[in-house]
Amino acid sequence: VRDYISGMVILGEDQYRVGELVKINGYEGYVEEVGLRLTKLRDFDGSLHIIQNGNISVVTNQARHPMMVKTEIYVDKTLDPERVNMALERALERINGEGYKKEVVTKFINQGICNMTDFDAVYSLYGFVKPETQWRMDRIIREIAIEELLKDGLVRERTLGERS
């Protein structure tokens, strides 16, 4: 009975729909089925999670609101931070420009150095994008950042065995 009542609440409140990306009780995937008794999620590895609606305590719907993309760029810490920031700002101008207008919800910003490793300064770039574009935009940001850093000679080759 609890499963059915919970199913009616889920459907009545339109908490999630078939095809949406959600997290339910720690399981993440695309909703394949929403019934009165059960919800079925398809995980990224292909696993099918079958969850009794009465056991659902936490739902995070990732398909209805903008998602944050936080991209960390590792750069040799001996390089001039001002030059690195200038290259990253050019990268963000490209990301925030016309070419990605459909994906970007809030302009990306450079937070500067957010961490250090033995070899690198870690720069953090972040912004919000439309749901389900966050992975693609993260890759694009990395590619464009590398292009801009290369233009200024701010990327070095690592030697074998060197770690970041």
Regions found by a protein language model. Give the residues of each.
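Alpha-helical transmembrane segments
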Residues: 1-2, 127
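Positions in alpha-helical segments
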Residues: 3, 69-70, 123
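Soluble accessory domains appended to multi-pass membrane transport proteins
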Residues: 9-102
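Solvent-exposed, non-transmembrane regulatory segments of membrane-associated proteins
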Residues: 79, 99-164
